Amino acid sequence: MGGKAAILVGEAAKRQQHPLRELELLCRLPAGSTPPTSIKAAPWSLDGQTLQSALPRPKDFGAAWVLMQEMGAALPLADWVELVGGCDGPAVRAACWLWLQGPQLLFRNRQGQIEARPGDDLRRLRKDRHRQVLLDRLQDQWHGFLAQRQPIDPSSLAPAARSELELLMAWASGDGQEPLPTGLRQALQTARCEAEPGAIRHLLVDLGQWDPHQLPSLRSTTWDHGFSPELEAEAERLLASAGQPMAGDGERLDLMHLRSVTIDDEDTRDIDDGLALELTEAGVQRIWIHVADPGRLVEPESPLDLEARRRGSSLYLARGNLPMFPLQLTTGPFSLRAGERNAAWSIWVELDAQGGVAASGVQRSWVKPTYRLSYRDADELIELAPPQEADLLALHALLELRRRWRQGQGAQLMDQLEGRIRVNGGSAELEITEPGPSRNLVAEAMILAGAVVADLGCRHAMALPYRNQLPATLPSQAELSALPPGPVRHAAIKKCLGRGLTSTTPAAHFSLGLQAYVQATSPIRRYGDLLVQRQLLAHSQGLDPLSSDAMLDLINKMEIGIRQAVAISREDQRHWQQVWFEDHSQGQWPAIFLRWLRPQDQLGLVHVEELGMDLAAECPDGCQPAQNLVLRVQLVDSLRDQLRLRATA
């Protein structure tokens, strides 16, 4: 058989093949004997009880060790067995050989020569074994903690246990590249925990080591780490210098006499845009759109600029927003604060009778917002129309005219209730935003500002982060008319629309109804808007703006952070939506079928007016758009990222 031998192993005489180098001859078959079919057969007649009876006493092994220490020489196996046991034979030799293979420390077997370990080695090995016993005991205790699923104190764990805890944390975060050790896997089985992220998150929550609302995608990102002490110190330095004269301040147009207003959500603290109305000497109504100017303090390629570029945007979470710049700047000198002089970029627009742009311009300025309004306050003023708010009412009328103009250019206006989950005091709460007149006013003003800046970029061949959208083939007017207005019709349109794209050259934006568009009104929250302002500044000062290639390089860098922020924000909203449904798992809601997502799996999209949400749900066969359904929770587990909804007729 070449380098292998066929042998019969154990009392059961199981046939196996092993390399000859792994085999050691203990006793030769006596002359004239027939090879036995089992080790229990003659001439060996060995079994467990026989071997146990033949094994010398522990003190005999100890005495042999002392003698061999004095001799200082190794012995062949047969001589060593006779020294230990006082005799030799198949049974005692096999018993002693098996003892050598066990956990004993006194001797070592080197190619059939038995050596007594030196005393120093023996003491070291015994010390190591004692230490290992203690470590094993601590490890067993740690694995016992897992089975108990009770809160633990990580600082009391042994290093090996802490390493395993860190490994479990990594798995819970979705990073399961490093395999779980066998002992840990067995401990998880005892703890009734599958070796998968969701189950491990449940276990870690029980152990008090995992925030049930921690986002795996947020872990170890720039937002998770916050701003470094160096960046915070730089922010404090800029905060202290904000009131001092800066380059270009003398060239700013003073617009503080205009009655400007900012309109935002009640809890918004970083105000990056405002509105004003001016009646020119020619009697023309001029719209002013003021935009915060963080570039006055933040130099290109400075540490804060590089960090903002890395983030790409602010991060919007249910528990609160994480800003692109340190908070003391975004809510301080960057923000358009009411009653204070603020540096800004101001975009002015005069509309023609149809709502098109008749004249426009962009100017660095000083502005002083007269007051701040919430959307609710602004809606009330627009509805009540008090004479002292004539400017606000005129702005509303002008921007409604502009909105109708865009609609005539093919813009898709799809206003509807929008629900999202916010966290209040640790609880998931549903917040529904209604498309009121003030929200439409602000949105239209921001789109108008983006159109004006994009037009300026087009006329001067300026590289900007233009936003565009390819033309789409929409359902026919007859098909849309057959659908009820609102979410059902909107879903049919949205299905046809392409993704928004960013490029350094202008192109039409289909759903906005514009030939060119750029986002330019949130430089505190979007790095791309800050890039726009820097290009405008270079142009206004007669300097060369960034080339298309240089702009594209910056866009690519910031979009890494933007994509990450979008993914984190979506995961966050999905998680808190699951938490909300856990709190309302017995509820049911009227729903309207919108369209099929995966008909083969009976997965469709439904709209729940009461929640202001479009949700994926299991739907009955043959559902048609606008069909009324009732939505219920089938399964929800926020730690496992699971939500299954079922809609029934």
Where are these regions (language model features)?
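Electropositive polyanion-binding surfaces
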Residues: 3-5, 23-25, 46-105, 112-113, ...
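Short, amphipathic alpha-helical interaction segments positioned at domain boundaries
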Residues: 122-146
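Short, charged N-terminal helix-start/capping segments
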Residues: 2-13, 20, 30-31, 173-221, ...
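Charged low-complexity interaction tracts in eukaryotic proteins
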Residues: 97-98, 102-130, 214
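Basic, amphipathic alpha-helix used for nucleic-acid engagement in HTH/winged-helix/SANT-Myb modules
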Residues: 35-58, 138-169
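Low-complexity, highly charged intrinsically disordered N-terminal segments
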Residues: 151-253, 257
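Long, low-complexity, charged/polar intrinsically disordered regions in eukaryotic proteins
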Residues: 2-52, 109
